[in-house]
Amino acid sequence: MNYQDNSLKSLKLGQKTEYASQYDRTLLQPVPRALNRDGLGITQNQPFTIGADIWTAYEISWLNEKGLPQVAIADIYLDYQSQNLIESKSFKLYLNSFNQSKFADFNAVQQTMQRDLIECAQGDVKVRLNPVAVYDAQKIEHLQGDCIDEQDIEITSYEFNADWLKDCVSDEIVEEKLVSHLLKSNCLITNQPDWGTLHIHYVGKKINQEKLLRYVVSFRQHNEFHEQCVERIFCDLMHYAKPEKLTVYARYTRRGGLDINPFRSNFENLPENLRLARQ
């Protein structure tokens, strides 16, 4: 995979940057989804028909018209059909630029963010800005399904290898939800670790859980963005397991006040945003 594209070379990610305190929409940086989809052969037609990159933004603050600081938490849904994904460090810098800028009210901030993200992503984006009090009653959730992590197996390789999924199914037709907390990959630019919980919901021939776990662990030294990893997992499962229906959903731990939770499916609606124990 060759990601040495001009759109990546210009990213602020991995570079020393200054933090702006006045609103600046030009801080947002796009990454074309085609960079990864070309290699997967899905640039024109994706095997998933429903999906979004679901972001939670915890560090949002601005000034009201009297200069009093305000804070909020945002849920952001970035449609999978957008031309670009949003590079996470640029998003953090963009959010920080609100800190010393005055806005009339919550709605003005929400509309500003939604407009700017739509322009950067070149696709549909939904932003919901919530007062902190909304989260007072929020529970720590868990993703329903059988956890595949407690298997007594020996692992000797941590290099990505989709071939772990070869011959991974039996003839038994099932509907299953499987969960692994062992998803770990590395940032494409900085090599920093990205920690996630993976949820797979499928209908089709039963998937061998040992083969699936070995495949998940093989991402451990793999360098890709969160969104790209989830699309790769979806494509690999469709290729090797050939399920009738499939959802792949990953919830990653927070970095820089942001968590990214890509969801791709060919049969399920988008989930409500939630929070897992590690988030």
UniProtKB/Swiss-Prot annotation:
Sites where the protein binds substrate: I86, E87, S88, H226, E227
Keywords in alphabetical order: Cytoplasm, NADP, Oxidoreductase, Queuosine biosynthesis
Record field: catalytic activity: 7-aminomethyl-7-carbaguanine + 2 NADP(+) = 7-cyano-7-deazaguanine + 2 NADPH + 3 H(+)
Coiled coil: none
Major localization class: cytoplasm
SUPFAM superfamilies for this protein: Tetrahydrobiopterin biosynthesis enzymes-like (SSF55620)
EC number, as in UniProt: 1.7.1.13
Cross-referenced PANTHER family: NADPH-DEPENDENT 7-CYANO-7-DEAZAGUANINE REDUCTASE (PTHR34354:SF1)
Name the UniProt record assigns to this protein: NADPH-dependent 7-cyano-7-deazaguanine reductase
Gene behind the chain: queF
